[in-house]
Amino acid sequence: MKYAGLLWVILAFTGTAFAQNLPSQFVISGETARKIHDFTTINLATAERIAETCERLAQKEGVAISIYILDNDGNHVYMHRMDGQGYLNIVTAEMKARTALMGREPSKSRMNRVIQNPDVELQQIQLGLFPNSGGLPIIVNDQMIGAVGVGGSAPRVAQGWSDEICAHKAMTEVLGPQPPLLEDLPPRAVSNRGNQPVPRFELPQGVTPRSSLPSEFVVSGKAAANIFDGNQISSEAAKKIARTCRAWAAEHGGAASIYIIDTHETFVHQERGDGQVYTNIHTAMLKAQTALQTRQPTSIRAAQLRNDPSGQPRQLMQFGFFTNSGGIPIVVDGEMIGAIGVGGGAGGGGDENCAIEGLKAAFGNRVLLPVYPQQKD
């Protein structure tokens, strides 16, 4: 017992030393860090600033991006996709971030190895790595606190733009001077290149998908034409929902994990409140997915299964639903445009209530919300 007590003293001292080495404005600190036994993981405020800076740079460049920021355990801390981004843009952003995290080096390093020796690409993929530029470790005072991945835009390195350059400039603005980027190697010439004609598949100029909803609610214009869909929740509406829910949770003394997805189950916006752990984050995602798949709030099944537990095996095992409250399909003027899932308790105020506050802030009385019958005395 004496040695066990000594070990806890050493661990506590080590945590304090880390806390002193890392500026508190960049990492989870104080009692929240002690609660999760980690003084070295990027906080939500820093992740959001990096993402929003990169998004601003992309807007200035006239391009759209998707961005993922992971903590040093590989959990999603902040994710956002700009309007018009498709599935591949979004998933490759995460793959780049995860590659930078696992290798503790820029994902371009893996890409350069493949350029120099194409035979290593299969091994890289087998290891779960994505050998492409756009992922960078986030390092403060020689301590890795997370990783960032950016995808979705065509590189124009000679003109000073690429996904990687966007991430690098954003981190420089938020964190201070960053190490120089690795050399951009010229792509290896493809031997025996074929001459097969490649078809085009795009809408005629000026033709865009139509929606009865206002443009601030859904993807519109050229962005909608890129994905052939005018009824997907817009990036700005998703941000407004999440920020309102985040503030509501803070007012109730806690934090939340939030996922907002479109009707194709593609991530639009995500954030992990400081102190939230894997189970909070993952359940938020499962709630959003279940709400989308069932087109019902997850609280409906949660109540039904409490009333009749015999349905649990089918709901959980055969259908794969997650039946805790906190997931709501996003239905505006009768049109489903996405789904939200909230996990982590929202400071005791309730995950579903947090989601409801966010939805009301974004869509007012045009959004469909769960209504509970009055209890009889």
Predicted features by range, described:
Residues 15-19:
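Sec/Tat signal peptide C-region and signal peptidase I cleavage site
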